[in-house]
C-alpha cells in the first residue's frame, strides 16, 4: 500500500511546534538515546516527560517545502529534524528555524520514518534500500539492498536494525556495517514497522498475519492471523501487543503466546499504529475516527471524528492526526 498525505509539510511542522511550545519536549539526555518511529523500539508512542507541558497553542514556527508529498514521520534529535519525502530525499532541518542543514538523495520515495541513534540516521527508500547516514553531514555510511521497496521504518535495538520490505521479508542488519544477520519471509508485503521488546520482534504483513520472531535468530515464535491485511505497526506495552488490521479491528495480543486478549471493531480499515499511554490505547481508523480504547477488555472507548481518514501518532499526551489518501500497489 502507498499512503499519500494530502496536506503540506508545514502542517506537520505545526504539530511539532506544539511540542516545542513553552519548553523543549525532549531533553538533551534523552536525545542521545534511540529516537525512532513512535519514540522507541516498543513503538508504544508514549514519552511521559512531554505530559504537562503547555501545548495549548499550535502556533506555526516555520515551514519547509519539499518537492513532493511527505509521508515520513519526523525524528527530532539534538535540535535537528530528520524527515523523508516522496521527492526521494532525506532532509536534516534546524528544529528552531527550519533551515536545511543537509539532504541526501535516494532513488525512490522516502516514506520510511528515520531512526536516529548514536549519530546515525537509519531510513528506508522505495529504491529497495536501507540507508545509514551520518547525522551531522548526511554522508552515506552504508546501504543494504532488499528485493522490494522499503516503506517500513527501521527499528534499532542492541546494535541491530530491524526493518520490513515489500519483498515480503523482515530483515535484521548489523547497525554498524549494514551486514545481513537474518531475514524472515512472510507471504505478503511488509509495510509494518517492527517493534522489538524483550528479545522478540513483532511485525505485521499484508498476508493478514502478525508475527513474533526471535530477535537474535529470526525464528518464528508465534503467528496470529487477522481477517485483513496488517499495515499497522505493532505497539508493545506491559506484555501486550496492540495492532490494527484491514478487517477494521484493533487487537490486543499476549506478547508471549500470541493469544488474543481482546478486539475492538472500528468502522473501516485500521492502518494507524496504536499508541499506548496510562492504560489507554489511542488509534485512528479510515472510518474518520480517532479512538481512545480502555484497556480492560476494550470495555470502554471514546471517539472523535475529524472528518477525514486518520493516521495517528501519540507522544506523551499530544496526538497528531492528518488526512490521507491510499492506493494499493
Q: Whereabouts are the PLM-identified features?
A:
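Secretory targeting signatures
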Residues: 1-37, 290, 295-329
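Extracytoplasmic/lumenal domain signature
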Residues: 25-71, 75-302
Amino acid at each position: 500500500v502507498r499512503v499519500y498525505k494530502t496536506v503540506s509539510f508545514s502542517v506537520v511542522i505545526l504539530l511539532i511546534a506544539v511540542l516545542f511550545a513553552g519548553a523543549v519536549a525532549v531533553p538533551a539526555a534523552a536525545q542521545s538515546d534511540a529516537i525512532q518511529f513512535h519514540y522507541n523500539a516498543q513503538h508504544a508512542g508514549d514519552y511521559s516527560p512531554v505530559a504537562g507541558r503547555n501545548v495549548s497553542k499550535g502556533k506555526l514556527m516555520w515551514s519547509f517545502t519539499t518537492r513532493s508529498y511527505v509521508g515520513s514521520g519526523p525524528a527530532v534529535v539534538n535540535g535537528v529534524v530528520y524527515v523523508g519525502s516522496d521527492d526521494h530525499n532525506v532532509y536534516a532541518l534546524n528544529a528552531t528555524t527550519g533551515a536545511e542543514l543537509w539532504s541526501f538523495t535516494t532513488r525512490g520515495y522516502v516514506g520510511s520514518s528515520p531512526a536516529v541513534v548514536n549519530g546515525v540516521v537509519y531510513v528506508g527508500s522505495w529504491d529497495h534500500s536501507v540507508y545509514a547516514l551520518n547525522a551531522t553531514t548526511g554522508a552515506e555510511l552504508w546501504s543494504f539492498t532488499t528485493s522490494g521497496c522499503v516503506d517500513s521504518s527501521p527499528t534499532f535495538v542492541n546494535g541491530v536494525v530491524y526493518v520490513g520490505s515489500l519483498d515480503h521479508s523482515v530483515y535484521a542488519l548489523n547497525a554498524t556495517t549494514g551486514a545481513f544477520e537474518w531475514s524472515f519471509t512472510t507471504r505478503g508485503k511488509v509495510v509494518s514497522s517492527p517493534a522489538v521488546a524483550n528479545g522478540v520482534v513483532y511485525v505485521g504483513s499484508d498476508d493478514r498475519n502478525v508475527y513474533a520472531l526471535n530477535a537474535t535468530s529470526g525464528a518464528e515464535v508465534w503467528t496470529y492471523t487477522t481477517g485483513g491485511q496488517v499495515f499497522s505497526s505493532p505497539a508493545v506495552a506491559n506484555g501486550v501487543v496492540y495492532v490494527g488490521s484491514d478487517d477494521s479491528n484493533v487487537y490486543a495480543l499476549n506478547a508471549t503466546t500470541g493469544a488474543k486478549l481482546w478486539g475492538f471493531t472500528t468502522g473501516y480499515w485500521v492502518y494507524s499504529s496504536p499508541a499506548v499511554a496510562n492504560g489507554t490505547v489511542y488509534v485512528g481508523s479510515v472510518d474518520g475516527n480517532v479512538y481512545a480504547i480502555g484497556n480492560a477488555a476494550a470495555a470502554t472507548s471514546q471517539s472523535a471524528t475529524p472528518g477525514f481518514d486518520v493516521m495517528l501518532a501519540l507522544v506523551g499526551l499530544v496526538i497528531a492526526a492528518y488526512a490521507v489518501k491510499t492506493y494499493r500497489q
